Each structure stands twice: as structure tokens, then as C-alpha cells.
Amino acid sequence: LRWLSWRYGELLRRQRAHLVEVRETCLEGPEALDRLAEHAPEEVAELGERVGEDELEEGARLALVAAIDAAWSAHLGHAAELREGIHLRVLAREDPLTEFEKEMGVAYQGLSGRILDDAVAALLEAPVADGRLDLESLGSRIPSATWAYTVTDNELGDDFTRMGRALRRRLAGRR
């Protein structure tokens, strides 16, 4: 069971490592503001006229980190939902691990755009008073926990196991 859980977790580990790298880069410098300004130039420029550069940079940093964390939590939730029924793919003669990786790969590809959209929205929704952003409202968007789980991808058994069970039930019924 550990080996199987490891196999399913490997894709998520690689995705997490990439997001952690992006997150750390955004925390260390002006990368967060650059990303948001590239994604929504007019909106970020307009906000920049209302608040100072340092304030905008810190707000972009907090908004992007909160969006990354929320998106990752949602991504893990999607993975958990997918894992709940992945064993049923065996009935369609599909490899559950391959199908899991396909679906989670597609989901991850859309994550970057959603993160930027959410971060820009959070930054623009933050209250501005006296040329300052309410940075505390941005920090409250950061999720406080994630979770881990184990899974089996073939709890119904392979074709021969299912046929054997059916045969045993049939023979037991005739005795």
C-alpha cells in the first residue's frame, strides 16, 4: 500500500515542488508584482497610482502567496476526489495511475492562470485608505492546512480476480 500511495503521490510531489519554487521566488523579490503587472497591467498600474510602490509590492506578494496556497489546497481536494473513484477505471480497462496522472496534469496546467486571476482579484479587492493597502485582509486568505491520504487503485481486483469471485459465488449458491 505504501508503494502504491507513493506512485500516486509522485506527480503531486513534482507539482508541489514547482509551486514551492514559484512561491519562494515571489516572496524574495519583486517577482510577485512583476507577474501580476504582466497578467493585468492596467489594473495593477491603476492601483499603483493609489498606493506606494513598496505597499503595492508587499500587497502583490501577499495576494500571490495566498492565491498559490488556496489553489494548491483546491488542487489537493480535486486529487482526493479523483482518487476516491479511480479504482473504477479498471472496469473500463484503463490503468488507474495513468488516468490519474492525465487528469491531474490537465488540472495543474490551468492552475497558473487561476492563481494569477485570484491574486489580481484579491489585490484589487483589498481596501485602500490614505494611500495604503489593508495588507491584513490579504493575509487572511491564506489557508491554514493541507492533508495527506493513502489509496488503492484496484480495490475491485483485476479481471481474473473478479471472475474468480463471481465463480465462487455461483458455485457456493449451487451447493
Provide a role label for each language-model segment:
Residues 1-175:
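Extended, charged helical/alpha-beta scaffold domains that provide interaction surfaces
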